[in-house]
Amino acid sequence: MTQNQLDKKSEAWSALFSEPMSDLVKRYTASVFFDKRLWQADIEGSLAHAGMLAAQGIIGKQDHAEIERGMAQIRAEIESGAFEWKLDLEDVHLNIEARLTQLVGDAGKRLHTGRSRNDQVATDVRLWLRGEIDLIAELLVALQLSLVDIAEKNVEVILPGFTHLQVAQPVSFGHHMLAYVEMFSRDAERLQDVRKRVNRLPLGAAALAGTSYPLDRELVARTLKMDGVCQNSLDAVSDRDFAIEFTAAASLCMVHVSRMSEELILWMSQNFGFIQIADRFTTGSSIMPQKKNPDVPELARGKTGRVVGHLMALITLMKGQPLAYNKDNQEDKEPLFDTVDTLKDTLRIFAEMIGGITVKPEAMEAAALRGYATATDLADYLVKKGLPFRDAHETVAHAVKAATSHKVDLAELPLAVLQQFNPNIEKDVYDVLSLRGSLNARNILGGTAPAQVKAQIARHRARLA
C-alpha cells in the first residue's frame, strides 16, 4: 500500500462517512502525542495476540511471521527515533498498525482480527502500568534503605518528639526516621496489591461483547505473564478502577513524602536548626544572598496536591459513564502518566537527598530540654510511687509551672523544691528526668529506646535485602 493510500485510509472507519473529519476535531480527539509512550506495551500485546491467532488457525503461519518481522522493524524505528508519529492516525495503536500494514501488507490488516481498540488500549495501559509499578517498587526500596541508613547513624541522637507541634517527649532521631520507613513499607504493600488487579487481561473482550472468533484468551494471558483474564467483556473494556486504585495508592505515598517534606522544611529553618540539607538539593535567592532554600521538599509538598488532584480527576471521569466504553476514557492517560512520572521522580530524588542530610544533635537536644520533654517521665515516676496517674499529672503540671517561672529545666530544680510537690520524690528522680533516661525507659516493642530502634533497623534490613 502506498503512502497516499494510507493517508486516504488514515481513519479506520472512513468508508462510512461522507466527509472527512475536521482538522479541529482531529487535534481535539488525537492522543498520539501523549499515549505514544505505550508503544512497547502495544507491540507486546499485538505480538501475543498474533501468536494466539496463529495458534488457533485464525491467521496463517506466514502472516504471523510477517507480523513479527514488521513489528521488529517498527520497534527498531521507534527506538532510533526514525518512526513518524502522525496526528491523522489519532493514537499509538493506529500509528503502529498503519506502519505495520505499510511494511507487510495484508498480514498487517489481519492483526486486528478478533480485537477492538477498546480491549487493546485497556491491555496496553495495564501492561505499561504493571511495569511502572515494578519500577516504583524498586525506588521505594531505595528510599527505605536511605532512611534506614540515616536512622542507624543516629540511633542515640535525641530529638524532641512533637504533638500539636509542641515539644512532647524525647525520641531517638533514628526512631523518627523509621516511622517513615513503616509508612513507605505499607505504600509498597498497597502497590503490590494493586498490581494483582492491574495484571489481568482484557484482550478478547473486543468492543464490548466478546467475539465470535475462537480466541484462546488464557494463552494470551500466559504469554504476557498476566495473572488471568477479565471475566466480563463489558467490565474489561469500560472500567478504569485499576488506574484509580493505583493513583489512590500513589497519592498516599506522596502524602507520606509530603509529611516528611514538611518536617525537613521546618527542621532546616533557623527557628529549629536541626538539620542541613546538602547544597546540591537546595537553591538560593535572587535578592537575599544569605538564603539557602529547601526547594526540593517544598516542591514535593506541592506536587502531592497535583497527584491527589489526578485521583479526583479519574474518579470524576468514571462516575457518570454508562457501560461500556466511552471516549471519556481517553482522559485517563494524562493524569495516570503524570502521577507515575511525579511519583518516580520524587522517590528517586528523596532517596538521594536523605543520604545527604547533616544532623545537628546539639540543637535537637537543646530543643528537647527547653520543652520539658521529660514531664511525662516524672508523672510515670510518681505513679510507680503509688500515686494515681491523674494526681501525678496534676502534680507534674505544678512542677513544670515552677520550672518555667525559674526559667530552668525540670532536672535543674533542686530536690527540696520537687519534694514540695510530692514528698515521695527522691534523689533517683534525676535519672528519670534526664533525656537519655527517658529514651532508655521506652524499651518496649515499637518504642524509642535505642535497643528497640536497633532491633527495628535489623528487621528492616532483612526485609529489604
Swiss-Prot record:
Q: In which pathway does it act?
A: Amino-acid biosynthesis; L-arginine biosynthesis; L-arginine from L-ornithine and carbamoyl phosphate: step 3/3
For this protein, the record's InterPro entries field holds: Arg_succ_lyase_C, Argininosuccinate_lyase, Fumarase/histidase_N, Fumarate_lyase_CS, Fumarate_lyase_fam, Fumarate_lyase_N, L-Aspartase-like
Q: Which reaction does it catalyse?
A: 2-(N(omega)-L-arginino)succinate = fumarate + L-arginine
Under which main EC class is this enzyme filed?
A: lyase
Q: Name one GO cellular component term.
A: cytosol
Q: What is its main location?
A: cytoplasm
- Which subcellular locations apply to this protein? Cytoplasm
Coiled-coil stretches noted in the UniProt entry, renumbered to this chain: none
Single annotated GO MF: argininosuccinate lyase activity
Is this entry keyworded Nucleotide-binding? no
Q: What is this protein called?
A: Argininosuccinate lyase
